[in-house]
Amino acid sequence: MKISYAITVCNELKEITRLLNFLIKAKRKEDEIVVLFDKKKGTPEVWQRISELKGDDCCSYHAKTFKHHFADWKNQLTELCTGDYIFQIDADELPHDILIEKLPQILEGNPDNEVYLVPRVNTVSGLTDEHIEKWRWNVDSQDRVNWPDYQWKTNLKLNGKIKYMKY
C-alpha cells in the first residue's frame, strides 16, 4: 500500500519548509509527497524551496494556476497522486508524527472508512487582529488557530469515487 501526501501551497515559505522536512523524515520509503504550487500567486522563494527537493524520488512538484475554486484545485492535486490512498494537507498544517507512523495501520485496519476526523496544528503567517475577528478564530499562546482544529481528511483509494465538490 502506498500513501500520497498531497500538499497545496502558495506563499507559505516557513510552513512548507517545516512540513516537507517533517514528511521526508516521517513517511515510509514507499510513500510519496506530491506538491501543487500556485504559480500565479505563489512566491519565487516557495518555488525555489520546493524545487530544491525535486531530485528526491519520493517527491513530485507541480506548478499550476489556482482558478479560485478550492474543490477544483484539490481535485487537480488528487489526479497527480499515484498512491493507493491520499492524505491531503495544507502547507500550514503539521500532522503529528505518531499519526504519520500509524496511518498505514489505520487505513489497512479500517478499509470501509473513506475519511477521518484529524486534529491539525494550523498556523497562519501574518495573522492580524482583523483576520481573527473576521473569521472568528481562536488563537492560543503558541499561535495555533482553533487548536485542536479538527478537519475531515480524505484517505481514499484512487478509484475516482470521491471528489471535492463546489458549493
Where are these regions (language model features)?
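Short, acidic/glycine-rich phosphate-metal binding loop used to engage nucleotide
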Residues: 63-70
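A conserved hydrophobic helix/loop-capping motif in glycosyltransferases and polysaccharide synthases
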Residues: 3-15, 19, 26, 36
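Hydrophobic beta-strand segments of well-ordered beta-sheets in folded domains
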Residues: 2-5, 31-35, 113-116
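Acidic donor-binding segment of Leloir-type glycosyltransferases
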Residues: 21-63
